[in-house]
Amino acid sequence: MSQSSTRKRLIQWSPHNKSSFIVGSNDLRLYNFKFKDKNEKKNENNINNSNQYNQNNQQQQQQQIQQQQQQQQQQQQQQQQQQQQQQQQQQQQHDIYSPKSITSKYMETYNFDIEYPPDDWVPQEKKTISLMSVNSDVQLMKCMAWCPDESDTNLIACGLTSGRAILTSFSSVNRILKELVPKHTRSCNAISWNPIYTNQLAVGLDKVRGDSSTLIWDINYLQSTTLNNHLHKNNNNYISKLQQQQNNIDQPYIISQISDNSFSTSTDYTDTIYQPISEFTQSEATLALAWLPNNPSCLLVGTGSKWLKLYDIRDVNSSQSVMAHQKSVNGVCVDPFDFNRIATMSEDSHIKVWDLRNLDDPLIIVNSNCKSIQQIDWCPTRSGVLASVGKDKSSIKLWDIKAPIEFSKSPKLESTTLSTGGGGSGSNTSNNLNKRSTSNNNNSQDPINTISKPTKIHHSSDVVSSFSWHPTNECRMLTVSYSGVIDVVSLNENIPISWSPHGGICFSFGNNVLEGPTKGETLEPNILNYKNLINDGRYEKDISSKIKERAIFGYSANVEENINLANKINDENINFLWKWIQKVPIQIQNFKRESSLISTPSISTTTPGGPITPSATTKTIINNNNNNNNNKNINNNINNINNNNNNNNNNNNNNNNNNNNNNNNNNNNNEYNGIYNILIEKDISTVESSNGFVIYKSPNRNLCLSICGWGFNQSLPLENILSRLEKSGEYERAAAIAVFHLDIKRAILVVTNATYNIHPVTQTNHHGHLMRQDREFSLKLLSIALAGFDGSSTSNNNNNNNNNNNNIWKETCKSTAKSFINPYLKTCLEFLASNSDSKDIYSIIEDSRINLDDKIAFSCKYLDYQDLIHFVERNTIRVIECGNLKGVLLTGLTGRGVDLLSNYIDRTCDIQTAVLAISLVVPKFFRDKRVSKWSSIYSDLLDQWELWHERAILDIQTRISGIDQPPTPQIFAKCGFCQNSFAFESISASSIVGRNASSKPNFKAKVPFCPHCKQSLPRCCLCLLPLNCMVPTPEFKKSNTTIGSGGGSIASSGGINNSGSINNPNDSQLWSNGSEPFEDWFTWCQTCRHGGHSQHILDWFKDHSICPVTSCDCRCSQL
């Protein structure tokens, strides 16, 4: 018992019968696997009971008949009377004890009507295994293979430890049909049937001196097919008893529970074959075999000396070999879905997948994470799925080499050698192969894909000895342990889920594809019940659903419509973007118009924003002149940071530098510039001192303030903005903006109004009440601090007592600001308590969490030029890295704006907003390859959703915003002599016709010759008049040129320059001037080269189909 428990057991499904399998070790056993439900078993038991009851009744009936016969002998005198009584009694007994009456009596209680199961119904089907037959003639077996021939479904080949290969069957009288005997006794390691030529059997043996280890046998299968007709007729009772030994395998099936009552009838003569038809692999052990289904003459051999060899049995001298592993090749198998893909294993932990078309390197290396692999096998029903089990392991691992998993690139684990030569492996061959291995190892350094994580792992209760895939069921596998436990394993693969572009969901299970509902309403609770919660626990809609809804609503490149859709878009950042796009072009245009009307003075004591108050101290600073050296360094640092940032964001774009240069060149024309580009331009700043704070003013700063919403003037006073913020409930921001403009009285009024307006709060819960109290307390505290502010606190002319009081007030404000939660209130007190120095204010605004537009406007007002550029630069880089749409305030729709949108797409996947926004400037002002890719992706997305109208609007708007470029001509008419074009814009000034010019000013003239070489043009084949060419006249030259002071000819739109060629060939007026009526166009056949005027040719072919040229049979109109 102990020996059998440690001996390796083999298991294999039948390729012919889906419910049969064999288990081999010391004997060979045939099993039947099926599903059986509880009702069926119960009915069979009842039927068996009724049959047994019928048999008992029949025996009783026979005993009664014998007693009646004895009574007839004793009562001979009354035979007639007794016979009559006997007949009556037999008739009564027959009516009572007949099988029909017994069956009907006991079977009428069983109801086989179909009943609907209840809601809590659980299926009662059970998996059962039946032992069908035992063949004890096969002993000491090491390998086995089921014959693939359909004509004999029970023929099995077994390899023994003695080296013999025997053919056995469960349906023949002689259990051992044939024996294949090698010359030398040695262990049989592998056996494999040819899948096409089923009479050929390959056997792999251990090595022996002077003999081959790979033998190809011809079993003469045609003579053995008659053995199927000799059935074993005397073992029916035995088989019927074995069929009753059924065990439920919800727990693993144990072989030791089966009785060892086996039989052997090998008394008949057995055919023996001693001569194989082919022999390979000398002086090497053959450990693995596999035939190629697509080429039945080729055999894969895994040897004990690290080699994987491919033989053609038709030519023993031709072979191809590769050093597959560092140790012996213990297993090889061919993928049933791709015959060029094979897998090999060794004594180490690696499985290698090869392509037979290129055996230089393996395709994939699978790291099984075990010391040694015992068995591998491809799944016959799922492509690319490979199963493996380690030695002395209780787990089976599945590897899906086609699954979308992450492959890790790793260097080669070993040298791979490829050789082509004879089948032997002598010393010369080994030396050559070693040389080839060294050279290949030096030249080949490419990494190989490695898989180390299995897609699924099945853990068994015992160490697995062998496993076998089911031939048709993709989820079923059989395993057998060393102790004889058979387990039916269900390996359900992971369910893949896929979203459709229309929002539906689809998933698959096995061969079935299930699609969820795509229509219907989603049931949601009342949103009002959760309005007071910060997070109501519901996920937001997928970004694809949002993009589709916005496209249907009319979200496009139309700025006005997008602003009207603000409520439907319901995104603060997106709404900010489109409002900025709406107002920035108007503000920049107004700024340029005002700048062109006002001449720039050398020194000015006024600012573009208005006159300075008499009490203010004013000083004029000309930026980029007095501080030229410092500003140069700042600009150089900015350019270096820009280049580094662009290179990081555009690693795959080879034209980044060109794009950036084009972007810089078009900044002046781009109406969507950001604050960053505005501030780095040359500017004249004036300094004003007010309430102890230094205020910087300049035209560029005023433009930035206007873009940020701080451009207050007579038409838009500060009071209007503060009133609007108060109505919207933004009291903290309103008070802060009033403080930043040093209007302390108005800030105190805002705080006073806030304490009255936030008191009647509608929130009735406890949390809302506490928030209201905290807000009210913070505002009252701010009003107290504002009341103590003295505008002269920062002046240097104050006495010591005032300075001491102001210092105490400042320290108190700084400590109070730390307790504020609202960033605006905190920044207010820190600003008032500062020393009015640019560096001090820089540190305050840098750490502030107020809105970006207010932060930039505040810095433009109180920071000097160097601190301002540095601050804007740092914030520009920050918003680009975060992909914050509000950062377009700094970057604008420029090259850096594309970088910002790229990070925005990576963060939110909202490619729709990026495409629509950037389409306003690309390719109108500059080009970027990323924008082209985004547009293509968004267009494909609209096509998938079948939003054809929205796609058409996108194409139209994109084309309108782009540069008008006429399509390149596809057909050129040129002279047959000089090969120059007849195009109107290509004609030089020397070809202008002047001798036949009329007094009436014309811009074009017809000439019957080439304007370049003066050769005659061909004639029309119908009217026989020469074809004409359009050339410009002298009047055209005079009307399209302007004489400069130097006497040179300066060409205007559509004119002729000094070099003699016409300028601006894209001008529409020029094309209309140079065009010729369609009836005079050149028209010719591409086959016979005959032609003429277009109108003449059209008129001819209305009634004819053959060329008008005599002796030409070309059917020009039918081409």
UniProtKB/Swiss-Prot annotation:
Residues 41-60, 413-455, 601-669 are annotated as: Disordered. It is found in: Lysosome membrane. Keywords: Lysosome, Membrane, Metal-binding, Repeat, WD repeat, Zinc, Zinc-finger. Residues 45-60, 427-444 have a biased composition (Low complexity). As a component of the GATOR complex may function in the amino acid-sensing branch of the TORC1 signaling pathway. Probably part of the GATOR complex. PANTHER family: GATOR COMPLEX PROTEIN MIOS, WD40 DOMAIN-CONTAINING PROTEIN MIO FAMILY MEMBER. This is GATOR2 complex protein MIOS. The lineage of its organism: Eukaryota, Amoebozoa, Evosea, Eumycetozoa, Dictyostelia.
